[in-house]
């Protein structure tokens, strides 16, 4: 009896302790006990005594399995997030390389000139915004391809210049085949977009400009200073491209903005060549500033081309492209940049060259804004032409009547018209 009572007391203690695991040893015991209390029916005291230790082991195994699964899920999530972060970093790296290969800021300026040409070429107050977007997108792709090819051909030169040695190709951030593939895809996509959404004339001008820039201007930079004038032709084509995309043809009015761009680029690049002459010499480029140590020749060239831009405002008004206000604005703007060029001509220092360079940066957006602000639509042009024709016809009729009147009058001797006392002047004579 004594043994049975001792065994019974010991088993009851085991059952109580096994049914309520110690939370200090197993932190999840309370939750597990709560789950077991709702999910399992009550059992007898003897069965609990026999299975107490087994229940604790099964609960511990269940907790361990749950913790292992949670750790595995956490590790999988961390691995996925690390892979996503690596892919995002890789995408950011190549996106930056494409941005620098395309010379995005310069390409945006090209797109701005092309878009201005498109708006001027519409000739009407209503502008086709889808056509404008297609033109700008195609121009951007062509410019990105041309600039990328330019950097591919000039890897060795760029590696010797301070301002270009950190570009993607000289620094090794992207391979040459990768850059070639990018330039090819961008150029082909831009030409196809212009051909399908605008017209073949615009696509042809864009493709020709790409070839002229990448395969003529780029190698010519290392051969002869005339490369600056060839590059000016390249810069003058985008507004012509935009005009052709809008109207499908090239007219006299379409040449005003390209002419302004051509003459504007000369003082702009002369100032840049003077400021970066040491870098150009290190890179092996044949710029005019390297053959003009005093800077007098490049200053004279810059000043002369500034004067060439003065008549453009009058021509734009005379040809019916803009209103008369543009004459005044264009003249004042051109005289302002000519003043900086004259200042550089008198005192050929880096400070004066930098002032002329900054003035050239300001000139182009203001000039294009004036063209857009004062442009005259086709209807207004026709009205002006009709008014001018009516004025000319009225003045012509007056001249004809006066001529007929003079012919109808008989010839009068000079003596009869003289103030003679006894010979009065003829009645039809009007002094």
UniProtKB/Swiss-Prot annotation:
Protein localization? Mitochondrion inner membrane
E.C. numbers? 2.5.1.141
Keyword annotations for this protein? Heme biosynthesis, Membrane, Mitochondrion, Mitochondrion inner membrane, Transferase, Transit peptide, Transmembrane, Transmembrane helix
- Stored Pfam families: UbiA
Catalyses:
heme b + (2E,6E)-farnesyl diphosphate + H2O = Fe(II)-heme o + diphosphate
Q: Which domain of life is it from?
A: Eukaryota
Its GO CC terms?
Answer: mitochondrial inner membrane
Q: What does this protein do?
A: Converts protoheme IX and farnesyl diphosphate to heme O.
Question: What name is this protein filed under?
Answer: Protoheme IX farnesyltransferase, mitochondrial
Organism name: Arabidopsis thaliana
Phylogenetic placement of the source organism: Eukaryota, Viridiplantae, Streptophyta, Embryophyta, Tracheophyta
């Amino acid at each position: 009896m004594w043994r049975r009572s001792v065994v019974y007391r010991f088993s009851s203690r085991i059952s109580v302790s096994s049914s309520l695991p110690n939370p200090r040893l197993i932190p999840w015991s309370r939750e597990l006990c709560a789950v077991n209390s709702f999910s399992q029916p009550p059992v007898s005291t003897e069965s609990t005594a026999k299975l107490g230790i087994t229940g604790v082991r099964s609960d511990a195994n269940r907790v361990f399995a749950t913790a292992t699964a949670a750790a595995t899920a956490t590790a999988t999530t961390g691995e996925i997030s690390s892979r996503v972060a690596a892919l995002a970093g890789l995408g950011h790296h190549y996106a930056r390389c494409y941005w620098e290969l395309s010379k995005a800021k310069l390409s945006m300026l090209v797109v701005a000139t092309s878009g201005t040409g498109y708006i001027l070429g519409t000739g009407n107050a209503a502008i086709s915004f889808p056509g404008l977007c297609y033109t700008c997108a195609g121009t951007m792709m062509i410019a990105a391809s041309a600039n990328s090819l330019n950097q591919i051909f000039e890897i060795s030169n760029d590696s010797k210049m301070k301002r270009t040695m950190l570009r993607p190709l000289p620094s090794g951030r992207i391979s040459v085949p990768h850059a070639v593939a990018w330039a090819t895809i961008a150029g082909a996509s831009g030409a196809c977009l212009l051909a399908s959404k605008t017209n073949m004339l615009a696509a042809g001008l864009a493709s020709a400009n790409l070839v002229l820039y990448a395969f003529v201007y780029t190698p010519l930079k290392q051969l002869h200073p005339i490369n600056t004038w060839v590059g000016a032709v390249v810069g003058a084509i985008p507004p012509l491209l935009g005009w052709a995309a809008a109207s499908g043809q090239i007219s006299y009015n379409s040449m005003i903005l390209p002419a302004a761009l051509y003459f504007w680029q000369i003082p702009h690049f002369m100032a840049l060549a003077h400021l970066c002459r040491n870098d150009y010499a290190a890179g092996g480029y044949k710029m005019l500033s390297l053959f003009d140590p005093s800077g007098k020749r490049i200053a004279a060239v810059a000043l002369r081309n500034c004067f060439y831009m003065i008549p453009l405002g009058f021509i734009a008004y005379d040809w019916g492209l803009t209103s008369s206000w543009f004459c005044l604005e264009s003249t004042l703007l051109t005289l302002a940049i000519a003043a900086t060029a004259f200042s550089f001509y008198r005192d050929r220092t880096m400070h004066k060259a930098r002032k002329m360079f900054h003035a050239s940066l300001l000139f182009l957006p203001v000039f294009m804004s004036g063209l857009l602000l004062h442009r005259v639509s086709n209807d207004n042009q026709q009205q002006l032409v009709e008014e001018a024709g009516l004025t000319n016809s009225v003045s012509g009729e007056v001249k004809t009547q006066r001529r007929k009147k003079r012919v109808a009058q008989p010839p009068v001797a000079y003596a009869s018209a003289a103030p003679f006392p006894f010979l009065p002047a003829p009645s039809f004579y009007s002094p």
